[in-house]
């Protein structure tokens, strides 16, 4: 029988860097996490994962089976470098090819959700044409994902185009496809001028996972838990009362810290204490 516990995961970039997934999943298990979210970012190293051999993919699957720690989601931020809204046809084609490979990779190793970065372009100036190309690129991507039975889920971003659940829902309604859903980040959502609780309620029925991090206005990364503006307890209460039962993912970038495991354990305890206050988990 499946556990009724809230699934709590950790972002790959919170754990020590390296390519040994057995070691990474063993550490995540030791730290008490149910799953790890893989990163495929714009660096050549992480992008190269999409070209893994059959044997490399099988090694990841075997590590999951051996440890019991799942890898159910991928954070696909490579589209910052190869955006779907690019006005350069070659760059945009690369972006679509990355999407195709990511969906195939997910299908091969059992990843269910690919979190998308909501940028039409990142390093260039946005305009109506970049937004149109982005929409068309999403439509093509969701068609690929539908055939593979892999969910694409839009993150709420550090970028005006996708700064709220309401904006992301506009794309969900435009695409009108069950394989396109939302993956909000309560940190990013709180850093903008949003009614956070109303936004979370509006997304219920489309939210497939939740990123957990702290932020400040204009500061979207590396804000220690408890030092930002996020009202975690209230967010957790809203999600619980709205009927959300899905996974939560602690997002951190401590892979280069002196002791990443200690940083992660501290964050885990802090987050679980807020979850306990919200009645989601038992107090430690």
Curated annotation (Swiss-Prot):
Keyword Isomerase assigned: yes
Top-level lineage group: Bacteria
GO molecular function, one term: L-ribulose-5-phosphate 3-epimerase activity
Keywords, in A-Z order: Isomerase
Pathway: Cofactor degradation; L-ascorbate degradation; D-xylulose 5-phosphate from L-ascorbate: step 3/4
GO biological process: L-ascorbic acid catabolic process; L-ascorbic acid metabolic process
Induction remark: Induced by L-ascorbate. Repressed by UlaR.
EC numbers on record: 5.1.3.22
PANTHER family referenced in this protein's UniProt entry, alphabetically: ISOMERASE (PTHR43489), L-RIBULOSE-5-PHOSPHATE 3-EPIMERASE ULAE (PTHR43489:SF8)
Protein's job: Catalyzes the isomerization of L-xylulose-5-phosphate to L-ribulose-5-phosphate. Is involved in the anaerobic L-ascorbate utilization.
Name of this protein: L-ribulose-5-phosphate 3-epimerase UlaE
Gene: ulaE
């Amino acid at each position: 029988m499946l556990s009724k516990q809230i699934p709590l995961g950790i972002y790959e970039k919170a754990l020590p860097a390296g390519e040994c997934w057995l070691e990474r999943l063993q550490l995540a298990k030791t730290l008490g996490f149910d799953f790890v979210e893989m990163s495929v970012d714009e660096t050549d190293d992480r992008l190269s994962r999409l070209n893994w051999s059959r044997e490399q993919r099988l090694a990841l699957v075997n590590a999951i089976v051996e440890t019991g720690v799942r890898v159910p989601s991928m954070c696909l931020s490579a589209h910052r470098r190869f955006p779907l809204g690019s006005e350069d046809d070659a760059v945009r084609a690369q972006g679509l090819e990355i999407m195709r490979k990511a969906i195939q990779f997910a299908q091969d190793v059992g990843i269910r959700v690919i979190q998308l970065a909501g940028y039409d372009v990142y390093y260039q100036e946005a305009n109506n044409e970049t937004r149109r190309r982005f929409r068309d690129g999403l439509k093509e991507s969701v068609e690929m994902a539908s055939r593979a039975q892999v969910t694409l889920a839009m993150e709420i971003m550090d970028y005006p185009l996708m700064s709220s659940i309401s904006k992301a829902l506009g794309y969900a309604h435009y695409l009108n496809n069950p394989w396109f859903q939302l993956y909000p980040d309560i940190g990013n959502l709180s850093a903008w001028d949003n009614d956070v609780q109303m936004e979370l309620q509006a997304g219920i029925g489309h939210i497939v996972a939740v990123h957990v991090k702290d932020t400040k206005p204009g500061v979207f990364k590396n804000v220690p838990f408890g030092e930002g503006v996020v009202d975690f307890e209230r967010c957790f209460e809203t999600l619980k009362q709205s009927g959300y039962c899905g996974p939560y993912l602690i997002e951190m970038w401590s892979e280069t810290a002196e002791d990443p495991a200690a940083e992660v354990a501290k964050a885990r305890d802090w987050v679980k204490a807020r979850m306990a206050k919200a009645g989601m988990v038992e107090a430690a």
